[in-house]
């Protein structure tokens, strides 16, 4: 469960890092399934935008009860998973994710959504760990994004 302080942090800052670690055996299963996916779809080496479309077995990991409880504490009990993506972050990958608002990519209104990010690779500044602009969610509106055709980006839009 998220603490009251963690929920307040999410409400104020727009993100929270829970005290949770996926069990090692589950991480190993995710890595094995990802390896199998890449054998069939090598084009997803850096990014797979809709992994459940290509391998429904990943849904098992999206149903983790602890993670679902965290989401329920943030959004309430009426929520749905509508997408699951895979961003590879091995060392010296060369693919960057530009600053963006997740809601710009999601056709969901109102913007009552959240992202659950589970790091499988070590998340460090050197390989592109997630960074957030504290409080940027409080405006509750999307900034316009422009298309960027740079092939070294995992996402093609940025403000």
Placement of each model-derived feature along the sequence:
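Short, charged/polar surface micro-motifs in flexible loops or helix N-caps
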Residues: 77, 91-93, 111, 122-125, ...
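Non-heme Fe(II)-dependent double-stranded beta-helix
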Residues: 1-108, 144-145
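Juxtamembrane helix-loop transition sites at the ends of transmembrane segments
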Residues: 35, 40, 121, 152-155
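Short, conserved beta-strand element in jelly-roll/cupin
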Residues: 100, 107-125
